[in-house]
Design a protein with these regions (language model features):
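Acidic, surface-exposed loops and disordered segments
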Residues: 1-209
Length: 209
């Protein structure tokens, strides 16, 4: 039986969804960039890394975005909103990614060429809905890393999936292949977040044999 929690386990326990932020707190862009760069170690389908980030830290833009965000207060009062976008044409990055793997010595040329061919062939034949579903999954994975890294740096966050995605895409003139999927508010809390219960562990796990 594990008795003492690791630093990672404590961080995961302490991370909460915070919706009340101290207005007027500025997070240096260098810190946000550091969080997002470190988060890119997240896994993704075929390592195609379909995530893209749009950081909104201008107060007037956050105020305007609150309307598309169904009037959620934290969109305006947090220090910044990190919009996580999903590229549903992720297979077009296969060559760049795998060429870099060769350059860095991570894989031989023949394996990289196979990865490029397989990714371009398979993903280009998936439907747009299938590719979007893959991007959704990968965006969720990197978003979890973002909020844990933010917590480790002393900031609180909340992940939001409920916002007018069409209005967001129009406002920021996103290309058709970049789909807004998640908004992450980040900042300093104005009050502690509530704890939240979890289903009994025995209810959510079973072994196959």
């Amino acid at each position: 039986m594990i008795q003492q929690k690791t630093a990672l386990e404590k961080l995961m326990d302490e991370r909460k969804s915070v919706r009340k932020y101290e207005p007027g707190v500025t997070i240096p862009r260098e810190q946000i960039q550091h969080i997002l760069e470190q988060a890119t170690s997240a896994p993704s389908s075929s390592n195609l890394q379909p995530w893209r980030f749009l950081v909104i830290d201008d107060q007037e833009q956050k105020k305007e975005l609150r309307i598309a965000g169904f009037n959620q207060e934290q969109i305006e009062t947090s220090s910044a909103i990190i919009a996580v976008l999903g590229d549903n044409e992720m297979y077009k990055n296969a060559k760049q990614i795998n060429d870099l793997n060769v350059e860095l010595g991570y894989m031989p040329r023949d394996i990289a060429d196979m990865m490029i061919a397989n990714s371009e062939s398979a993903y280009s034949n998936f439907s747009e809905i299938e590719r979007t579903n893959i991007a959704h999954l990968d965006v969720g994975l990197i978003s979890m890393q973002v909020v844990l890294l933010a917590k480790d740096m002393g900031y609180e966050t909340v992940i939001m999936g409920g916002f007018d995605k069409a209005a967001f895409a129009k406002k920021y003139e996103l290309p058709a292949n970049e789909l807004p999927m998640i908004l992450i508010a980040i900042g300093k809390p104005a009050m502690p977040a509530r704890n939240s219960s979890r289903l009994p562990f025995e209810q959510i796990i079973r072994f196959s044999s």
